[in-house]
Amino acid sequence: MSSSAMEALHALIPEQHQLDVEAAAAVSSATSGEESGHVLQGWAKRKRSRRQRSEEENLALCLLMLSRGGKQRVQAPQPESFAAPVPAEFKCSVCGKSFSSYQALGGHKTSHRVKQPSPPSDAAAAPLVALPAVAAILPSAEPATSSTAASSDGATNRVHRCSICQKEFPTGQALGGHKRKHYDGGVGAAASSTELLAAAAAESEVGSTGNGSSAARAFDLNIPAVPEFVWRPCAKGKMMWEDDEEVQSPLAFKKPRLLTA
């Protein structure tokens, strides 16, 4: 290598160092390869006005850019893989079946709560027993019917008789209305004395059957009692009631006169 080439190389080293610093700053600020290329091209165009680059300088600059550009290569972010959500399973605790929702599980559980039809029992499978005829049962009920009819006939055939005139009436209300005439005197005026005596005797017999009757006591309770009193003499010649105060004589008491000769 000639001395002129050596001098040119030594003069190129400081300039190359400055170029490396500026290129590194430009590459670090760029976000992509194209933007860094545009910046370097603009920077190279500005520097061409000062001095023409040689082929060796261009080659060295290209190698430097390639070496630095490989280190700053940015890897594209890989798309995240979204896993499909696993559907939740709702399992029946009775039969073990799985369902996609809780509502479906609830509807299935209602089928377990419904009572299953019970199998037919032996009593239901047994043949039916033949029932006796209705005509065989009816005769047994006839005596009761006849007895009730007899009692009703006896009640209807009862005779209501007046104890005063011995008349008969079909009902008790008619007999009561008839007896009211006896008490008012309408029938008693026309009745004979014998009938009245018989009625009085019948009433006395009815009254004697009761406790404490007027016939046994020989007095009538409707008549006021006669007051009982006893006279007793007093020492002074006055009459007094037994339980009352002294009764004064209506006449004035006269003193005895003394006769003088």
Curated annotation (Swiss-Prot):
InterPro entries: AZF1/2/3-like, Znf_C2H2_sf, Znf_C2H2_type. One of its GO terms (cellular component) is nucleus. The keyword Nucleus applies. This is Zinc finger protein 1. Disulfide bonds: none annotated. Keywords: DNA-binding, Metal-binding, Nucleus, Repeat, Transcription, Transcription regulation, Zinc, Zinc-finger. One of its GO terms (biological process) is regulation of DNA-templated transcription. A zinc finger (C2H2-type) spans 90-112, 160-182. Highest levels in the root apex of wheat seedlings, lowest levels in leaf proximal region. Potential transcription factor which binds the nonamer motif 5'-CATCCAACG-3'. Possibly involved in regulating transcription of the histone H3 and H4 genes. It is found in: Nucleus. It holds the Pfam family zf-C2H2_6. It comes from the Eukaryota.
